[in-house]
């Protein structure tokens, strides 16, 4: 709340989170919504990973907390993640305030235009049709997550927490700071990511841009075989130095 100024217009809320994979509880969302309502701040809710929740965690949309919150919320969503339709480039925004919805529509029609009719039909069918395949994919993601987290925490020098949702793991490399790996002195995640790419031939995302310089992001949105190979290369990379 201390960060709010007279210039603050909106809070961007990513839930489930990229890059951490954490999920906000209903109580946390209520606390955030209360602050936003008190200061007349809109909530831009990025809920693209809403179907990917694990360990029985239930997703709560901030817009579902009441009519007043709904009017102050702009939901950003799509089918790229939960429905594995990345190449279709389909997304949408929804707002309980019709005035904002009209402005968004006008802006979109003049600046970008619409996505293809075929893409729109595919998105509608994905969201309206049977959801069995979506649940099957979620279960597979959960299995991959469990393997990645367990295996990573067995490797000396690195660790991670188990994420609640999405398909990312934040690997803690704090113990590697100061070491020389792949011919580079590791000062932060940028150094590690580059060294691991050059020597281990594995691409991870530095979290320096997320204000987490001692972490890199892994994804488990790939096959279990690829995950195993990546972790094998991590072990080899750390042992060889």
Residue ranges and their predicted role:
Residues 1-241:
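PLP-dependent class I/II
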């Amino acid at each position: 709340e201390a960060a709010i100024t007279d210039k603050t217009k909106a809070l961007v809320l990513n839930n489930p989170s990229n890059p951490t994979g954490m999920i906000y509880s209903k109580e946390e969302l209520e606390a955030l919504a209360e602050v936003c309502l008190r200061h007349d701040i809109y909530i831009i809710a990025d809920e693209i990973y809403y179907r990917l929740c694990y360990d029985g965690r239930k997703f709560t949309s901030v817009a579902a907390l009441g009519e007043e919150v709904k009017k102050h919320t702009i939901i950003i969503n799509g089918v790229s993640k939960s429905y594995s339709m990345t190449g279709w480039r389909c997304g949408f925004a929804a707002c309980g305030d019709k005035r904002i919805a009209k402005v968004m529509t006008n802006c979109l029609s003049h600046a970008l235009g619409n996505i293809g009719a075929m893409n729109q039909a595919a998105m509608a069918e994905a969201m309206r049709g049977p959801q069995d395949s979506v649940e099957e994919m979620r279960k597979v993601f959960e299995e991959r997550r469990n393997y990645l987290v367990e295996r990573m925490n067995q490797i000396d020098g690195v660790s991670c927490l188990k994420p609640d949702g999405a398909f990312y793991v934040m690997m803690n490399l704090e113990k590697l700071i100061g070491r020389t790996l792949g011919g580079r002195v590791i000062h932060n995640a940028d150094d590690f990511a580059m060294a691991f790419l050059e020597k281990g031939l594995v691409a991870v995302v530095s979290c320096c841009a997320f204000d987490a310089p001692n972490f890199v992001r892994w994804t488990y949105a790939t096959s279990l075989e690829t995950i195993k190979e990546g972790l094998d290369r991590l072990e080899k990379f750390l042992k060889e130095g």
